[in-house]
Amino acid sequence: MYKYKKVRRISSNLIEDANRRYIVSLDNHVELMEALAAFCKDLTVYCGQVRGIGAISEATFRMYDPATKQYVDKTFSEQMEITNLTGNVSQKDKLPFLHVHATCSREDYSCVGGHLLSARVNGACELLVDEFGDTFAGREFDEETGLYLYKF
Ligand code: FE
């Protein structure tokens, strides 16, 4: 589903074993969020950040309306470049919980983007995952917003 390599040193200020950085290459045709979740679970990444670029054939974004607390999903089924993917990893129900946003460019160079639900890799997907191994970041349902917010 993916290949990865651990970056040997992030900076001289960080404790190498507690804070880990990985270069991750997702396999072609996998579903991005599923593969990233599998990576985080396999490598026990429960607190971290993710960034990346890649090429995909389909993406589904989710828009949340805070007024109605309803989700509206929209799928774009076309070849696109992930011009930027940014997200974080926390822990919910003892599993890695991903919160990822992405901007994707289309054939005409216009962009679509938002909160990423799923994407199908078609070409390559190259990610950098930073784990903050000694930090706990959970998730808790928040009545006011209707979202699972950070619980520290
Ligand atoms: Fe979001």
Task: Describe the predicted segments one by one.
Residues M1-L98, T103-F152:
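N-terminal intrinsically disordered, cationic/polar leader segments
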